[in-house]
């Protein structure tokens, strides 16, 4: 029995070495990015609760944009990984073109929305339960931050188009290096511009936004310039700019398979943002506590998020090469490994997570809320790891309609109503509400297990 389990779910060293060589650069890249976000969050937090809350709300809105970009590039990446696995560089080039067009279109829409409805969107998260005018200040700081952050959306879109194509070829080092340089720049400029160190003026939340925008341009330039210099390693760039068309067959295939994925990312992100809005009716303290907790949680969930993302690349390449049994075998082992690593990280977060809120310059009530939110997130995290791995398994085989139902439809049918009803119509404390809403992940785990086990995702599409 044990031998059978080991054969099915435990790989040998060569297997894990291949997996980790792909995953570790991505984990390190995101670890550095989230660490700098954490430091940025602390520095903004030193300015006051209103500044921290205003910035947090805008970042929540930008999160929806980021996921829309992720959805746009992921739609083409379904085919990109399989095109590369098959050696079809022209097909890979068409998927790259699609990414550029889609991300720039999404960016244009986001900028227009922020320009016309920015104030109204931020105000949705501001409920004045105390009557001290703190919400008006949070709105003011949020608008200042948002105005500058919009300038950084275009380089982010271009960078994602290039970086995802580079990763599909198995080259994860350069995107990681670019990210390291960018986040290092961001961290230094944050400190200088937020607090007015040396010749720099004290810009507060505007300084935080400027630092982020400058870093995004640097990251995009590094990735784009490297890709064009090393054409031999990035053959999808051959002819990428000599024309602008995408053959109807390829475009239709990407849209049919990818549109549900794009919509899924947008609707899921919008759903999570709506859940946060539901929590926010309990007051500005809750917004601040959630901001601190999510920043800490993001430091610990990097491992399972990136291990899950690698599943779609590895399994996608096996499927593209027609190695269907190898794809199933690798998927089983990667899911188990991802969950195992997450259990370790969750235990660590549960033990040490409560120390982090004390770093922030805020009230004791907000620190206590943040500590409770962190503990709840640690308990639920291993279940999130399994559902996340299941999602990328289904996506690797092009089952985007299934992933749409699994992810965003689940969020809007189960999670959002639960958060809304509990926050608006019960007398439960916010921590109890948060625990119950997070606990809906258990339902998703069961659904994910059944769908992965059915092998509906074992499909060669190219």
Give, region by region, the residue ranges found by the protein language model:
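Short alpha-helical transmembrane segments in multi-pass integral membrane proteins
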Residues: 1-23, 80-152, 200-259, 315-380, ...
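Transmembrane helical elements of multi-pass membrane transporters/channels
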Residues: 21-40, 148, 159, 182, ...
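Transmembrane alpha-helix boundary and packing residues in multipass membrane permease domains
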Residues: 26, 30, 42, 59, ...
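Generic alpha-helical transmembrane segments of integral inner-membrane proteins
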Residues: 27, 31, 35, 39, ...
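Helix-terminus/linker motif at the lipid-water interface of multi-pass membrane proteins
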Residues: 31, 35-53, 122-136, 192-203, ...
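Small-residue hotspots at the loop-to-helix junctions and early N-terminal turns
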Residues: 49-60, 142, 146, 209, ...
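Small-residue-rich hydrophobic transmembrane alpha-helices
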Residues: 52-112, 156-175, 289-353, 384-403
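Short runs within selected transmembrane alpha-helices of multi-pass transporters and secretion channels
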Residues: 73, 77, 148-168, 175-186, ...
